[in-house]
Amino acid sequence: MDTGTHVVMGIALGGIATLDPVVGSDPAMAHAVMIATLAGSQAPDIDTVLKLKNNAVYIRNHRGFTHSIPAVLFWSVIIPAILYLFYPQADFLHLWLWTLLAVVLHVFVDIFNAYGTQAIRPFSKKWVALGLINTFDPFIFISHLAAIAIWYAGGSPGITFLSLYIILVGYYLVRLIMQLRIKRKLHEMIHDEIESIIISPTMKFRQWRIAVTTAHAFYVGRSMEGHVVILDTFNRVPVPETDVMHAAKQDDNIAAFLSFSPVYRWEVDTFKDHYEVRFIDLRYRSKGHYPFVAIVHIGHDLTIRSSYTGWIFSEEKLQKKLKLGSI
């Protein structure tokens, strides 16, 4: 989820914590727990600073190790340990438990995004992405703001936020049912044997992005108001084992893209003084354009000249990025 949603979830969890007698009966303890749940709700996203280095490092690592089981345990210990220095009278066990719950909740809700996390690392480096909830979901965010307003107006924080989360469980179940219906329709529409279906949510409640992989083709579509439409179809052509493609895969930007994207197509163009290899993620079609790409320019001597991976919405901007990234 986005930073703002994690913040309001941290506040909500701090409110629910007041139902714990150890927390609710001690204002200082309640204050410490609120700080802990806010910190715990943000800690796994500390890897966002990797954006300052480059997109390749960020794509490879964001929501990776910082969302893993060892990291969850680390955050749940270090945060209350620091807070205990300032709140020595706090009950450390309960402070730790609420911090742990905040970190676990952060990782858990991120699993439901299309991006996913490496939540089961170190047992597996697989990205777990259920694709039920958009990174920013208006209903989830606004409902949290409403609950915070009720608390501010004098409502019980514990009862208010606990009631909200019961409602949100129902909301997630509704999203799951919607996704399953789309999958059923896709199996009815596509007669080729389906290998995988990726359904990604959007900001709009009843609109989803679709990418289907079969043995021979990729199908890209949308589900709008319950109607599934296939917008593009691409032949599924294996990536060739050529010297140019081998050189491309050695580039950090290309390698990062391939480690992250589960469904993509590729293009190779030959120019007077270089080759251009392009990989295009098929999950994020927007207004007829596929904005998430990785591209590399390779000289005829197979040396990397420039490369880029990330979100690009015009060819002009892409070429500027490549010029800035020239080696």
From Swiss-Prot:
Main location class: membrane
GO-annotated cellular components: plasma membrane
Disulfide pairings: none
Alphabetized Pfam families for the sequence: YdjM
PANTHER family: HYPOTHETICAL MEMBRANE SPANNING PROTEIN, MEMBRANE-BOUND METAL-DEPENDENT HYDROLASE
Function: May act as a negative regulator for the transcription of mutY, fabL, sspE and yfhP.
Subcellular location: Cell membrane
Entry keyword set: Cell membrane, Membrane, Transmembrane, Transmembrane helix
Protein's recorded name: Uncharacterized protein YfhP
Source organism: Bacillus subtilis (strain 168)
Disruption phenotype: Cells lacking this gene display increased rates of transcription of mutY, fabL, sspE and yfhP.
Membrane association type: Multi-pass membrane protein
Transmembrane region(s): 68-88, 92-112, 127-147, 148-168
Induction: Autoregulated. Transcriptionally regulated by sigma-K. Expressed during exponential growth.
Signal peptide range: none
